Amino acid sequence: MGALGLEGRGGRLQGRGSLLLAVAGATSLVTLLLAVPITVLAVLALVPQDQGGLVTDTADPGAQAQQGLGFQKLPEEEPEADLSPGLPAAHLIGAPLKGQGLGWEATKEQAFLTSGTQFSDADGLALPQDGLYYLYCLVGYRGRAPPGGAEPRGRSVTLRSSLYRAGGAYGPGTPELLLEGAETVTPVLDPAGRQGYGPLWYTSVGFGGLVQLRRGERVYVNISHPDMVDFARGKTFFGAVMVG
């Protein structure tokens, strides 16, 4: 009986101790669960916020300097200017002169003079320096067969355009032929058999080539039928450009 009494009393003590341990563990767990969110809220309340929660202030001067350098815009490099002078060039367009002559316009529409080139109807195109030049010329022509009673009636016409040079190192002697082109046209008679003019015809004589020229030499155009030149836009022009 004494032994049984001791065993019962000891079992009750062990059960009571287990219950106390369980209560203590549960209390600690609840305390821990409540402490974590409270701590997080306290930290968030103390952190300075700006611009949607991003931290912009820092106590480290070095970090501020690095942040400023990160947003620094580098200056754009300006392209180097091309200091080399342009090559001499000229483009002249045909213009009528008094007395049914062929003149040239140097400043209107597409015409131009660059890098020291000069022009006058009396002296022609003057080039400013020695070099290899590409010369070109195109002359448009138009006309019609004369009336039936006139002579020559229906005869072929040879149209010729030429480029010459004179002056400068070449000297004041006879101008030298540089380039030339020609075209033969046979005007059509009046198809109705009347004694009037034939239908209007159009053609052009064009050519170009490389020529070695010296400073001061003058280039000009000579044509065979100035009274037949077509002065419509883009039909008659000549020019030069230095290529070497």
From Swiss-Prot:
Extracellular side: 49-244
SMART domains from the UniProt entry: TNF (SM00207)
A Gene Ontology BP annotation from the UniProt entry: cell surface receptor signaling pathway
Membrane topology field: Single-pass type II membrane protein
Coiled-coil annotated spans: none
Gene responsible for this protein: LTB
The name this protein goes by in its record: Lymphotoxin-beta
Family: Belongs to the tumor necrosis factor family.
Residue ranges annotated as Cytoplasmic topological domain: 1-18
Domain THD: 88-243
Sugar attachment sites: N222
Keyword set, alphabetical order: Cytokine, Glycoprotein, Membrane, Signal-anchor, Transmembrane, Transmembrane helix
Top-level taxon: Eukaryota
Subunit structure comment from the entry: Heterotrimer of either two LTB and one LTA subunits or (less prevalent) two LTA and one LTB subunits.
Chain ranges passing through the membrane: 19-48
